[in-house]
Amino acid sequence: MSDILQRVGDKWTVLVVGKLGDGPLRFNELRNAVGGISQKMLTTTLRGLERDGFVTRTVFPTIPPRVDYELTELGCELLKPVAALGEWARKNTARVNAARARFDAAVAETSVR
């Protein structure tokens, strides 16, 4: 169970699954939509999601080749908890940042002594 939680709790997995929730995307479309992800990390994330059954990869016989990524039924089931996590993060970002600032200030104060 921990390996599955590790996969679905990964930052990039959450972002990729969220973007694919709007429909199939090509690699570069997905990379642009996610933002801040390297080509290598996106490749690794997509391969892991495909291996675990969350994403399908479809290669179209065109020139140049076209590859689409799409959520499977299992991936679509993951959308609801991913969306809830994203909503929670948006709602609580200020509170988390305030807690971090208080903690950092307390640590800085004790290290000065």
In which residue ranges do the predicted regions lie?
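Hydrophobic residues in alpha-helical membrane-spanning segments
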Residues: 25, 62-66, 82
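Generic structural "secondary-structure junction" signal
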Residues: 7, 62-65, 105
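N-terminal helix-turn-helix DNA-binding core of bacterial DNA-binding proteins
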Residues: 1-41, 47, 68, 76
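C-terminal regulatory/oligomerization modules of transcriptional regulators
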Residues: 51, 56, 73-113
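Short, flexible helix/strand-to-coil boundary loops that buttress conserved ligand/catalytic motifs
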Residues: 31, 59, 82
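Beta-hairpin "wing" of winged helix-turn-helix
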Residues: 50-70
